[in-house]
Amino acid sequence: MSDKQTPENAVDYKATLNLPGTEFAMKANLAVREVKWLEEWYADNIYQKIRASRIGKKKYVLHDGPPYANGQIHLGHAVNKVLKDIIVKSRVMDGFDAPYVPGWDCHGLPIELKVEEKVGKVGVKVDASTFRKACREYALSQVDLQRKDFIRMGVFGDWQDPYLTMNFKQEADIVRSLGEIQKAGHIEPGLKPVNWCIDCGSALAEAEVEYEDKKSDAIDVGFGVVDLNDLSARLNVEVQDPTDIVIWTTTPWTLPANQAVALHAEIDYQLVQVQSDRGTQNFILAKDLVESAIARYKLENPVVLADFKGAVLELLQLQHPLLADRQVPVILGEHVIATSGTGAVHTAPGHGTDDYKVGLIYNLKVDNPVGGNGVYLPTAPIFSGEHIYKANPQIIEALGATGRLWAHQPIVHSYPHCWRHKTPIIFRATPQWFISMDAKGLRECALNAIENDISFVPDWGKNRIESMIEGRPDWCISRQRTWGVPIPFFVHKDTNELHPRTPELIEEVAQLIEHEGIDAWFNREAKDFIGADAEHYNAVRDTLDVWFDSGTTHYAVLRQREELTDPADLYLEGSDQHRGWFQSSLLTSIAINERAPYKGLLTHGFVVDEKGRKMSKSLGNIITPQDIIKDMGADGLRFWIASSDYRYEMTAGKEIFSRASDGYRRIRNTLRFLLANLNGFTPSTDALPVDQLIALDQYILQRAAEVQKTVQQAYEDMNFHIVCSALTNFCINDLGGFYLDIIKDRQYTTKADSAARHSAQTALYHLVQAFVRWMSPILSFTAQEAWPLIPEQTEQYVFTTEWYDIPVASTANLISEADWQTLISVKSAVNKQIEAARNAKLVGSNLSAKVEIWAKDELQSVLNQLGDELRFVLITSQVNVYPYAEQGESTEMDGLRVQISAAEGEKCVRCWHVLPDVNTHADHPGLCGRCIINVTGSGEVRKYA
């Protein structure tokens, strides 16, 4: 009878086990530790070291769209910068030299408003030069503020030498780019209607306009036909009663500027007669709108006197409803529709783009009776000195008094607002400078580039920017502001022509700006540049639209910095930039270079809360990136961003962040297991050739190679949520749920220097080398934390390496991948049966179970390949496989039945397997025969698992 192990004769076998050990902490504590790592990295010039590692390699340039240098960064900024950083780091891992030069947009109204709060308005409390100096200082302070936050997120770049649109050199190059566009014939002056913010006192770019609901006065106004005989002749019907062509408008204040009424040549119209309290009245309305219009006028029973096309009435004279001395013509326009209103459009070329365009055809006067402050000018025919919004009710009252108001009702409709002030804008014609979309074929060239030269992620970005380019008006590039790059033109006082030396003068001004900044222009007079010609020329004192500043960075940054290329490989911004930076960059580059400034455009969605609402102070739902970093660290923030599908709106909130944290922990714990089990492993002496590895280890490396293909392709396609899914799924399914669980026994219980253990460690070594690289573009801090803990690491930073070459067995694997997939399915089915037996109190842990399997022929042969090692795969103490019979319990697998019972024998104190031979060896009480061989003998031999 063998001696049983008792407390008195117990031997401590712990020292004979190969226990894991690593400095890689279980608890990340990222919020604290990341700060320390950043200090070390930047003290070591990490960005420069990454660049140095790629000298001579093919370039990949992601050009940074400059955020505005004003205020703390928000979550949208974080999404944008982290996505860019992931792309740059993954391209470096691909072997590219991928420089990243961050930039800031530094001119413009928001900065002016902030500075006005401190020093007052220009010309009131401060002169323009002092004001510009204060603007420059403020912008620089905001750059410093935002730069710290971007660095804190682990975004690598040339933070010490970013581009700023207010740098003297860049201001000069912005002026030079203007000169190039002027030289190419795309710039022209004009009195044209532009988006105008009364509060800003300036024109607005298309990208500075937002649409919000607004309550307006909708009115139907009659323009009386002056010559009824002319009308009768045109319609071939006798017309004797008063006849109005009725327009419908929501901007009564624009009626003093009316110059015409537009119909559509091909729309069907009707002359209808009704009886009103004013007597017999005729209306001319679109046929499809007669019923709704007459009902709106609270009239009944219209009698149709004539049907005709709009073209019949071209140039018919109408009486202006407010101005007795003004008659206006009927004109024809393609913009007129018959789906709402009356089918007739009030036309004021000074107050609308369509009106302006059709006015050019008919040579209509571009009348603008409204000043930049929203007050009617002294030259206005009526309501001079009155604010337009205060004049609205007066205009409506006057129309009623003259009998020209047929309907008046308030409506709520979508209306353009200033993005800064959130107030309604107006359209007003002012003398401005424009980049013409069609004079030199700019629109056509831009559309051709979109169609043929640019790739889009996601695909719908193409249609979006295409439709915007197709429909956009000429680009008004001039602004009446103080803090901006000048338009250094000299305009002849009589002819309005530019000075004949304009190209040379622009270069002269640019050279001065390069040394003195924009004050070089504003602080000099015309005679300083053109001498005696100053008597005949005015110097333009307008500034450039800030979208021109950022839109010409392909010229002022990409072309000027030797580490960058023009065109760039990629521009990446939020979806609002199809009408902003993407468009301004495309148009200026086409104008200068006749090609796009980018090969690809990537668009990301906006951040919303868990209810799908945009974040705003009023809703109290703002989450800042700083708050997330305090809680989850920058890697937590980065993982949330990467795991979201940025093509759509990105949801932020506690539940979403909790899921991201869970995913991060899964990856971190897996990484810790890999590192811990490399304890004592020296790759140069202990690693085995892949063809000599145990079958299971060969399989996991083959799976890792497949995952790496998915990861690399996902990075290349910029599908980072697929990368995150691939990482977490590999951790959960392939490693945590299968491989790592199985190898624990081999890792801990076999001889330390055995081939069985070294086989597993060789696989783990290759896995961790690949795994850390996979995660490094996204989980940069955690990847670099783990990197130096990999045995015999030679590179200082993971960021200077390339994708790992995972070795895959060249000979036919001992067990095919298909058979391993079958074994995984069997393992899952067996585990469910063990769980059921555990719930029935038949067994405790898996190792206390005996598994009996009845399998059909093909399945049986797969299982029998492993022989006795099948128990290691199933993580049970005993397994028997029999030909298929109706015994045991059926499972989810066809042809597989399983019976679970308590394993026979006793529990080994070292490996915890329950085996009959435990305590049968007097010299080794408590041990199984396998452990005795591993402790005192040559060690067990494994072939499969």
Curated annotation (Swiss-Prot):
Keyword terms of this UniProt record: Aminoacyl-tRNA synthetase, ATP-binding, Cytoplasm, Ligase, Metal-binding, Nucleotide-binding, Protein biosynthesis, Zinc
Catalyzed chemical reaction(s) = tRNA(Ile) + L-isoleucine + ATP = L-isoleucyl-tRNA(Ile) + AMP + diphosphate
Q: Show which residues constitute the signal peptide.
A: none
The record's section on Gene3D superfamilies has:
1.10.730.20, HUPs (3.40.50.620), Ile-tRNA synthetase CP2 domain-like (1.10.10.830), Valyl/Leucyl/Isoleucyl-tRNA synthetase, editing domain (3.90.740.10)
Q: Where does ATP bind?
A: 617
Q: Which cofactor does it need?
A: Zn(2+)
Indicate where this protein is primarily found.
cytoplasm
Entry protein name:
Isoleucine--tRNA ligase
